[in-house]
Design a protein with these regions (language model features):
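Acidic catalytic/metal-coordinating carboxylates
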Residues: 33-36, 59-63
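Conserved phosphotransfer cores of two-component systems
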Residues: 26, 42-44, 66-74, 85-94
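Acidic, metal-coordinating helix/loop segments flanking the phosphotransfer/catalytic sites
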Residues: 18, 30-48
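Receiver (REC) domain active-site loop signature in two-component systems and cognate sites
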Residues: 55
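Active-site residues of response regulator receiver
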Residues: 52
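C-terminal output helix
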Residues: 18, 103-116, 120-124
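Two-component/phosphorelay signaling modules centered on CheY-like receiver
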Residues: 10-29, 96
Length: 125
């Protein structure tokens, strides 16, 4: 079972994503800010960091950079309504998928599955 760490500051979106991802069989741990995700990344293995970009205290890009330093094999997917603006700021983000809000749940699930299907085909899991 894939383990997903979700960092999303919008309460309703976070609850919705947790329920939906768990319903299709993923184990999801959710936090409402990037600073809460760091100790979890240090303590537990996760397959995917699913993070909003615009969050208080630590944005998703900084979180992804720190996650890559802590767990180099973790995959990253950004979910945001501000993808174009946030990623044009000239900051280096780890290789990641970007899913722009609003999105349909099936699109999110398909992207997660595609990320790990590619790895399975290349023998990385």
């Amino acid at each position: 079972m894939l383990r997903i760490l979700l960092a999303e500051d919008d309460d309703s979106m976070r609850v919705y994503l947790v329920r939906a991802l768990e319903r299709v069989g993923y184990h999801v741990t959710a936090v409402d800010r990037g600073t809460e995700a760091i100790p979890l990344l240090e303590a537990e293995p996760f397959d995917l960091l699913l993070t909003d970009i615009v969050m208080p205290e630590m944005d998703g890009i900084e979180l992804a950079q720190k996650a890559a330093a802590i767990a180099p094999d973790i995959r990253v997917m950004f979910i945001t309504g501000f993808a174009a603006v946030a990623l044009k700021a000239g900051r280096k983000a780890p290789e990641a998928k970007v899913l722009s809000k609003p999105f349909h749940l099936r699109d999110l699930v398909a992207e997660v599955e595609r990320m790990f299907l590619t790895e399975d085909q290349h023998g990385r899991l």
